[in-house]
Amino acid sequence: MHNTLFRTALLAAALGSFSHTASAEGVMVHLFEWKFNDIANECETVLGPKGFGGVQVSPPAEHKQGSQVWWTVYQPVSYKNFNSFGGCEAELRSMIARCNAAGVKVYADAVFNHMASGSGTATGGGSYNSGQYQYPQFGYNDFHHSGDITNYGDSNNVWNGALYGLPDLNTGSSYVQDQIATYMKTLLGWGVAGFRIDAAKHMAPADVKAILDKAGSPRAYLEVIGAGGESPDIQPGRYTYIDTVTEFKYGTDLAANFNGQIKNLKTLGESWGLLPSNKAFVFVDNHDPERAHGGGGMLTFMQGARYDLANTFMLAWPYGWKQVMSAYRFENMGTYETDKGAPGSTPCTDSQWNCEQRRPTIMNMVLFRNRTEGQPVSNWWDNGNNQIAFSRGTRASSPSTTRAARWWPRCRRSRPASTATSWGAMTTAAAVMSPSTAAARPA
């Protein structure tokens, strides 16, 4: 990793006087496995002041118990109780209000493809038994009974089969749709701005749209992992008529180039086979590929400084609705425990929490992105290998490198005379990756 050590420093003093001009959503951060009270504090002290536009929070519906593993929050038991791993209903509502007051929109992860497996008492006190298809709001007739998913080349098998054996809700049922829509409308009434739709590719697009329509058509981004050899009916492009869709290929393309030659990123966008920019929800990684779920090939926090640089590029480059991952470490005695739940400590108080959103390399680029929103790329420069620079319209330039040699590329500043005053204060509004001043950070 010695040849990829660098530091990204935004000239924050120059940018500090700029007002936020982000698009409606702005940059999202996924505070993975954070408690609601901690999220509220982060909105007020970091996310709002630094210009983040939104925060994704864990599914707030009551769910299967088991804080020692992270995935229990993705096994809901009912949609009428809001006591979850993140906190109680009062803490949830307080967090939403406080984040909104700080200028940070709240997007709730929503799981309604399936319900929890096993039996017992949920985090909100509800009883369930998956063997008998008994849940507080649902019974046997509210589920599909088509066995497990065995063939991703058959869309009906994917939509109606059980994912990892989890009871598959019949999302085509009006009753089921109404229960989920009521849950979503409750959250919207409390101030939630929208939803991430988990496992959307495992539901027919028409079902997802019907539920969202009944909920009042809130803003949503749908998790659809495209994969070669699978049915064309479950590819990301089949869901874009509903709303924004996760573009996992963006992350794998970034990784391939940051592990190769970043000069090729000059044309990154729809011409690479990616979704249209206004339909793409993009990230360097998220909680699934980080744990080798849902496909691999992405950079993660384990790649250290290279990962930071990829995030910096994502925030500087004009493509998609962007999300930064805020993760935690899950090593144990030299091995990776991918099921491991969040550390018991308060976020960002020890080394178990990564808190990527607080790193200057990433945090300061949010303001860069906000200030350059809507500006085209111009003045591209590269050295034919791993040093690049480009400007964003008349506002900013971003040089970067993945090599450890001292360099400072010459990049024309597109400074019109009419903006001399603001540019005089700005000097060089640039994200500067300076390997010569880099400090080693463990991968």
UniProtKB/Swiss-Prot annotation:
It comes from Aeromonas hydrophila. The active site is at residues 198, 223. This is Alpha-amylase. Keywords: Carbohydrate metabolism, Glycosidase, Hydrolase, Secreted, Signal. Belongs to the glycosyl hydrolase 13 family. SUPFAM superfamilies: (Trans)glycosidases, Glycosyl hydrolase domain. It catalyses: Endohydrolysis of (1->4)-alpha-D-glucosidic linkages in polysaccharides containing three or more (1->4)-alpha-linked D-glucose units. GO terms for biological process: carbohydrate metabolic process. It is found in: Secreted. The keyword Heme does not apply.
